[in-house]
Design a protein with these regions (language model features):
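Non-catalytic cap/lid and distal C-terminal segments of serine-dependent acyl enzymes
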Residues: 36-64, 68-367
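Bacterial N-terminal signal peptides
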Residues: 15-26
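Boundary at the C-terminal end of the N-terminal hydrophobic targeting segment
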Residues: 28-30
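Bacterial N-terminal signal peptides that target proteins for export
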Residues: 2-16
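Residue-level micro-sites within transmembrane alpha helices that shape
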Residues: 11-12, 26, 238, 267
Length: 367
């Protein structure tokens, strides 16, 4: 028997928790980190009594060098305003990386550990918490028969969900991340709340599994990926999808099922598109690390084009995987496999790009 435990987090409660944490931080006065000033600059603080040098490295610009006061607290501010957005950052204390211990918002990932700086926009961006109906985040523990181990997955259900059967998007993370990263850092739930509220996307369930079916154990990606993708795909089809369809009001038809992923998750997506297209009608690959293309017969190619209503591939021209995406797209085009290929100018391999890709991709689903 497949046992499950679940925890459910209404998104409005998560927003309230953030406000409580901000209130507690305010009471600590000078201990707040990060602290956003009215002019848009951000101040960081760190206690490191015996350190000789402390700096902050983040996605928001140049490194910030901190100075120590008489109490042993290091502090420093960005020299220019930080634009609204969601950023990763870390302290470098005498050359060693550290999270911001005063900031409760930590990016879920296997390595390296980073803290999250979220500056809301005016008006709100899709990834900001807004005063609109919110869905619910569920966290499930389950036993995988394929992998013979206990696993975890995250499920987003849209606001106002009833017993009506809904389509499902299976959404995979990248190599250094885990099943919680798409919500806690990618803000997938807030993005879908916004798109559904604006009627840009249809109500759907999003399932975010652990895309590491095999522990990477420090292996380089190219050596690790083929076996991991085979194991993940089998677990997805034999454990995860049946689990979801037995616990949620889901339309089980492949026409109501999509898969997307970023980087390593994009590797999974393209593998599924070419090898298991009968199970999905929509596939999205965001900044993918493309897999090897299997030997495909004319009949295989006909089936792929028939099964997939959309094969959406996107990559930035500043991404280190751009050349591989170019080569992959050229090869499937040569094979007459239909796809929608998007090149994003000046985009690199980072979460701001992938949030935008989720915003672009989900409105195309289940129409």
């Amino acid at each position: 028997m497949n046992h499950s435990t679940a925890m459910t987090f209404p998104i409005k409660h998560l927003a309230l928790l953030s406000l409580v944490l901000l209130g507690l931080s305010a009471e600590l006065g000078a201990q707040v980190s990060p602290e956003l000033a009215d002019d848009g600059r951000v101040t960081f603080r760190c206690r490191a009594d015996h350190a000789d040098r402390v700096a902050v490295h983040g996605q928001f610009g140049a490194a910030v060098e901190l100075e120590k006061d008489s109490s042993g607290t290091w502090s420093g501010s960005t020299t220019t305003p930080v634009k609204p957005g969601v950023y990763e950052y870390r302290f470098k204390i005498d050359g060693r990386d550290s999270i911001d211990s005063r900031n409760p918002h930590i990016k879920p990932q296997r390595w390296p550990n980073t803290s999250i700086l979220h500056i809301a926009s005016t008006p709100p961006a899709p990834w900001d918490i807004q005063d609109i109906p919110h869905g619910t985040i569920h966290r499930h523990s389950y036993h995988s028969k394929v992998l013979e181990q206990d696993r975890e997955l995250i499920v987003y259900t849209p606001p106002g969900m009833t017993d009506e059967k809904l389509p499902v998007l299976y959404l995979a993370h990248g190599y250094s991340d885990n099943q919680r990263t798409w919500t806690e850092h990618g803000k997938a739930h807030s993005i879908l709340d916004s798109l559904i509220h604006e009627k840009k996307a249809v109500p759907m369930i999003i399932v975010m599994p652990d895309a590491h079916a095999i522990d990477p154990g420090g292996k380089k990606f190219n050596a690790y990926a083929p076996k991991n993708t085979e194991a993940f795909s089998r677990e997805l089809l034999e454990d995860v999808i049946p689990f979801v369809e037995s616990h949620y009001p889901v339309n089980p038809a492949s026409t109501h099922r999509a898969f997307a992923g970023l980087s390593m998750g994009g590797h999974h997506a393209l593998f599924l598109a070419l090898s298991h297209s009968e199970n999905f009608s929509y596939v999205g690959a965001f900044s993918a690390a493309p897999p090897a293309i299997p030997d495909l017969s004319p009949q295989d190619i006909t089936a792929i084009n028939k099964n997939l209503r959309l094969l959406w591939i996107a990559c930035g021209d500043k991404d280190f995987l751009f050349a591989r995406n170019q080569a992959f797209h050229a090869k499937i085009k040569e094979l007459n496999i239909e796809s929608d290929y998007q090149i994003t100018p000046a985009a690199d391999h980072s979460w701001p790009v992938w949030r935008d890709y989720l915003i672009d991709f989900t409105p195309k689903l289940f129409r």
